[in-house]
From Swiss-Prot:
UniProt-listed Pfam families: PapC_C, PapC_N, Usher
Domain of life: Bacteria
Chief localization: membrane
PANTHER family referenced in this protein's UniProt entry, alphabetically: OUTER MEMBRANE USHER PROTEIN, OUTER MEMBRANE USHER PROTEIN YFCU-RELATED
Primary gene name: yfcU
Organism: Escherichia coli (strain K12)
Similarity field: Belongs to the fimbrial export usher family.
GO molecular function, one term: fimbrial usher porin activity
Protein name, as recorded: Putative outer membrane usher protein YfcU
Phenotype reported upon loss of the gene: Deletion of the operon under classical laboratory conditions does not result in any major effect on E.coli capacity to form biofilms compared with the wild-type strain.
């Protein structure tokens, strides 16, 4: 029969605290209660003194390491909270809320500046704010604070006010995306190999982020055609540093300061590359309902393909996708303007098209202003500066009742443009905005754009609406009409080259994005449509529409059918077609499917098998026909701790054999340590996890779990900026002989930050031991046993027995009571085979004086009579057992 007495004794201190306070203890409760110590079954004549705890809500003066919960939301870190006795009534105790802790509450400025402090400014004076409740929940090691919303800054679920934003720690980052492909032609025997990549290296120093982007391409082709005048080997290689830049957050302004090479991201004007500086309201700092629209890129790959997203020659995103429809939705809302999409198929075909990212109506909360100020010199590809000095500014002012007034100006010596617009929040009907932009251009010589002065106007209307009840969103960001003589800054810069053919010259642009899920009907619809008309050339129309239906057929559950129609046009070439897919479950984590692709002169049909091995790994196999030839392809993807790995292989009868590899990852190094990791957002925000040196600890945060390396470090990448991110240890997958006493952390990080959070993890065996002092007695009840890392690994019972975690051969530990280490124990090496047979451990005193256990610390909860002052800090009392 198991002996439960040891368990009872180990939790006895907290049983007393909970019985005394009813789990939750008000710091300034008034009612008194009485205790009968006879309910405690203790051995011998152990003394119990509960008179100090007869006041409801009383917490013994001392230091407690607690998780602070503000309005049911935990703050990012645990805090050492001091309790001090009341000056007028020592039977009451109060929590010392330091200025650093109060700063995390997100109080309004007028509330924070009127707060009063006690203990020489070290503690918030209690009772100042009406309706505030502060309670101690010792069972959960928590300080629970309730603050009326009227005292707090604007908040949103999972979004924190600026007072809680974390700039992270200093460090070095190096992120990369590498794609390698090899191809062998069956006819002629030609071979081609290509390696392409892009990435970001950078340094974080305090709030500053310094970055450099690179991109590279290597191609090697070997022809076996003796009649080919270009036969033989051909090698092309290129390496470029595409961009140097730096930025930092300005939390007090809810803005971002950027320096170096940049792309003008404007809510009013068309963008272009420049070198200079800007200060702008950062939409990422705004609550989610006020942020911009993140680009959504969709397409259809006929075979396994490499998809490259670029802007003005700079690669923004590159990945490998399997055959079929794809959507890229993780670019972030900081990317705007015209994006160029290039899809390189394994069969050698290339699709290219441009998309114009939709823009949300430029609205602002009433009484607030959003703005952008920029200046510098325009820049061509390759860091070449062109044109003269320019400057510009734009702003949106929330007037009242949902109305916003916005406008801006941009120009240099020979080009000026100005815009004025108005927006309206229609509440349940969405939001709409209308603006007019006028441009004046002075051309000094004959160009493709003409000569002399040109004046023109451009008119734009935008609309956006979320249908929360229907899980859908429609964003309509065009109609835009431009007069023939209207010029953007980019067109003006092109006009400086007299030999250049005129670009742009837009007439009309329509852009619509619609996404809706009819949950009850099991139907989802997605539409992305763009149409451009021009004054001097043919129009272009691009669209992608997906219709999916999920249904059951008899005993077969969760079947699906989807239909995709698409058209992409670029450089007078159009690719259009239709893709159909029917899938059904096959076991718990697998599906079988039929896929057909018809159009653009290439028809194909395949039967596929998809299987998800675990949360991090899946693969896909397809066999079918393409152009009346047999085709076989496979695709494998793994989200590893060190990198995201994608593998592909393709065989097309009589035409080609190919294989591909894609790696996306990075390295992060700080003074706290570092790790290799996977990533998709180059140079983006990340969270460095420290598991106290314990390897193979599974950490869940963003996507599949990552595991700590041999140094106990891991990186959770691609975390959201200015969002409350959470990471936690998967306790079900912890290594054997590892325990986590703290398994959840959270952080709200500024853009590009390297956050740092530490888990309390103990590694080693478990043992039941008995501690004895030199005089044969034992340490007092409630004494703590700590290892050399200051981790509490055990709590002494009333007979000196202790349950130890994290036991290692020959390890040194110390025993603490009254906040002081009194004696040391050394574990045997090797450890005995049976660690639960009452291992006797002598506790050797520290210094020349043997430890003495005085009577006044024998009570279950030690009485401490000293009053806390800033110069005489309270004795430490652990609250984590």
């Amino acid at each position: 029969m198991p002996d439960h007495s040891l368990f009872r004794l180990r939790i006895l201190p907290w049983c007393i605290a909970l019985a005394m306070s009813g789990s939750y203890s008000s710091v300034w409760a008034e009612d008194d209660i009485q205790f009968d110590s006879r309910f405690l079954e203790l051995k011998g004549d152990t003394k119990i003194d509960l008179k100090r705890f007869s006041s409801q809500g009383y917490v013994e003066p001392g230091k407690y390491n607690l998780q602070v919960q503000l309005n049911k939301q935990p703050l990012a870190e645990e805090y050492d909270i001091y309790w001090y006795a009341g000056e007028d009534d020592v039977s009451k105790s109060y929590a010392c809320l330091t200025p650093e802790l109060v700063a995390q509450f997100g109080l309004k400025e007028d509330v924070a500046k009127n707060l009063q402090w006690s203990h020489d400014g070290k503690c918030l004076k209690p009772g100042q704010l009406e309706g505030v409740e502060i309670k101690a929940d010792l069972s959960q090691s928590a300080l629970v604070i309730s603050l009326p919303q009227a005292y707090l800054e604007y908040t949103w679920p999972d979004w924190d006010p600026p007072s809680r934003w974390d700039d992270g720690i200093s460090g070095i980052i190096a992120d990369y995306s590498i794609t390698a492909q090899t191809r062998h032609e069956e006819n002629g025997g030609d071979d081609s190999n290509e390696i392409s990549g892009n990435g970001t290296v950078g340094v974080n120093l305090g709030p500053w982020r310094m970055r450099a982007d690179w991109q590279t391409n290597y191609q090697h082709t070997r022809s076996n055609d003796d009649d080919d005048e270009f036969g033989g080997d051909d090698t092309q290689k290129k390496w470029e540093w595409s961009r140097y830049y730096a930025w930092r957050a300005l939390p007090s302004l809810k803005a971002k300061l950027a320096l170096g090479e940049d792309y003008l991201n404007s809510d009013i004007f068309d963008g272009f590359n420049y070198v200079g500086g800007s200060v702008s309201t950062d939409d990422q700092m705004l609550p989610p309902n006020l942020r911009g629209y993140a680009p959504d890129i969709s397409g259809v790959a006929h075979t396994t393909a490499k998809v490259t997203v670029s802007q003005m020659g700079r690669v923004i995103y590159e990945t490998q996708v399997p055959a079929g429809p794809f959507r890229i939705q993780d670019l972030g809302d900081s990317v705007s303007g015209t994006l160029h999409i290039r899809i390189e198929e394994q069969n050698g075909q290339v699709q290219e098209y441009d998309i114009s990212t939709a823009s949300m109506p430029y609205l602002t909360r009433p009484g607030q202003v959003r703005y952008k100020i920029m200046m510098g010199r325009p820049q061509e590809w390759g860091h070449h500066v062109e044109g003269g000095f320019f400057s510009g500014a734009e702003a949106s002012w929330g007037i009242a009742n949902g109305w916003s007034l916005y406008g801006g100006a941009l120009g240099d010596e020979n080009y000026q443009s100005a815009a004025l617009g108005v927006g309206r929040d229609l509440s349940t009907f969405g939001a709409v905005a209308f603006d007019v932009t006028h441009s004046h251009t002075k051309l000094d010589k004959d160009t493709a754009y003409g000569k002399g002065s040109l004046d023109g106007n451009s008119f734009r209307v935008s609309y956006s609406k979320d249908f929360d009840q229907l899980n859908s969103r429609v964003t309509f960001a065009g109609y835009r009409f431009s007069e023939e003589n209207f010029m953007t800054m980019s067109e003006y810069l092109d006009a400086s080259d007299s030999e250049m053919v005129r670009t742009g010259n837009d007439k009309e642009m329509y852009t619509a994005t619609y996404n809706q899920n009819f949950r009850d009907a099991g139907v989802s619809v997605y539409l992305n449509y763009t149409r451009h008309t021009y004054w001097d050339r043919e129009e272009q129309t691009n669209y992608n529409i997906m219709l999916s239906h999920y249904f059951n057929m008899g005993s077969i559950r969760n079947m699906s059918v989807s239909l995709t129609g698409y058209r992409y046009e670029y450089d007078n070439r159009a690719d259009k077609g239709m893709y159909i897919s029917l899938s059904m479950p096959w076991g718990d984590n697998s599906t079988v499917s039929y896929n057909g692709n018809y159009g653009s002169g290439t028809d194909s049909s395949q039967v596929g098998y998809f299987s998800r091995v675990d949360d991090a790994t899946h693969y896909q196999l397809n066999i079918g026909t393409s152009d009346k030839h047999t085709s076989v392809d496979g695709y494998y993807s793994h989200d590893g701790s060190l990198a995201q790995v994608d593998l592909s292989a393709n065989y097309h009868e009589g035409q080609y054999t190919s294989a591909g590899l894609s790696l996306q990852g990075g390295a992060t190094l700080t003074t706290h340590g570092g790790a290799l990791h996977r990533t998709q957002n180059m140079g983006g925000t990340r969270l460095l996890i420290d598991a106290d040196g314990v390897a193979d600890v599974p950490v869940e945060g963003n996507g599949a779990a990552v595991y700590t390396n041999m140094f106990g470090k891991a990186v959770v990448s691609d975390v959201n900026n200015y969002y409350r991110n959470q990471a936690y240890i998967d306790l079900n997958k912890l290594p054997e002989n590892a325990e986590a006493t703290q398994s959840v952390v959270q952080a709200t990080l500024t853009e590009g930050a390297i956050g740092y959070r530490k888990f309390a993890v103990i590694s080693g065996q478990k043992a039941m031991a008995v501690l004895r002092l030199q005089d044969g007695s034992h340490p007092p009840f409630g004494a703590e046993v700590k290892n050399d890392n200051e981790q509490t690994v055990g709590l002494v019972d009333d007979d000196g027995s202790v349950y130890l975690a994290g036991v290692k051969p020959g390890e040194h530990m110390s025993v603490f009571w009254s906040g002081v280490a009194h004696c040391d124990i050394n574990l045997p090496d090797p450890l005995p085979a049976d660690l639960f047979n009452g291992l006797l451990l002598p506790c050797q005193h520290k210094g020349n004086v043997a430890p003495v256990v005085p009577d006044d610390i024998k009570p279950v909860i030690q009485e401490q009579t000293q009053q806390v002052t800033p110069t005489d800090p309270p004795v430490s009392v652990s609250a984590n057992q």
